[in-house]
Amino acid sequence: MTFGEEGKEGARVNDLKEVDTARTYTGGTSEEYLGKINWKKRGLVMDTKLYPNVAHVRFQSTGSARISHSPEDLRKYLDISLKALQTDSIDMWYLHGPDRSTPYEVTMKAVNELYKEGNHGMYTIVGICRANGYIQPTAYQGIYNAIHRKVEPELFPCLRKFGIAFYEFNPLGGGFFTGRYRSLQDEVEPGSRFDPNKGQGRNYRARYWNEPYFRALSAMEAVAEKHNLTMAEIALRWISHHSLMKREYGDAVLIGASSTKHIEQNLIDLEKGPLPEEVLKVLDEAWLSVSPYATPYFH
């Protein structure tokens, strides 16, 4: 949550009900902000996550707590999230990343115990859960867009087999897919998604900031101009109509922006129809050209 004012319910105009946050977002203040807006009374569904930075040095800042998916930390930080959100339960709780310092059997047992206590609904390891009679994962949140399709050949078949919904983030590539940037030499706004002086910026630059991606972007901009479409519109209409995501499986698109104006336009674009064949052809060719350089969907 990077913006907002109490009493504004623009999202509800579009019948949006689900809010996605995480303990790590804006140093925990995202959860705290959401806790102040009476989200339950507004009829909203709340999802949050716990990232295990103990296993990922690059996500450990000076003085920050070391968080794992051990039973102790799961209980401790779920309680912190619940207090920040001013609730006694949430609808979905994600294990935000892999914790290779804690055996999955130990983590899943703890998650199941918390579920039975009524602290969370769905969460997102199927074999371990089935073997032990634990609650099974119900959702996977991952990166997916027209120029990053690494999830298609391996992950989607797995999710479909086990009845797990896919929650997609990064439909606009963190802003890369908006036409805002055009070359490796472009200046970026301090604190933005591609700021090389920030950890998040370095991650996004590793993902998209290279010559093959900029060449693909140039081809997409040309076809966008020809059909009088915006780059963001192309990205959102692709994910809505031409990706492997299906509403009947419970799949969902996560969108975010720096202003309510951007959110409103994104929602409008998501509701538009399929893209022209020529645009799809250019997108497919763009993905083929960058796929050897695309980062893994997992870490």
Kindly label every feature range from the protein language model.
Residues 1-9, 56-63, 160-223, 293-299:
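Glycine-rich, positively charged active-site loop/lid region within alpha/beta enzyme cores that binds
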Residues 1-48, 116, 189-190:
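N-terminal binding-site loop/beta-alpha segment at the start of enzyme catalytic domains
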Residues 4, 57-150, 154:
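Glycine/proline-rich, positively charged
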Residues 17-18, 43-49, 89-92, 120-124, ...:
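Structural preference for beta-strand elements that scaffold enzyme active sites
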Residues 19, 34, 46, 81, ...:
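Conserved, mostly hydrophobic/aromatic
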Residues 22-24, 49-53, 95-98, 122, ...:
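Active-site beta-loop-alpha junctions enriched in small/polar residues
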Residues 31, 35, 78-82, 108-112, ...:
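Generic structural signal for well-ordered alpha-helices
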Residues 206-271:
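Conserved short secondary-structure transition element at the edge of the structured enzyme core
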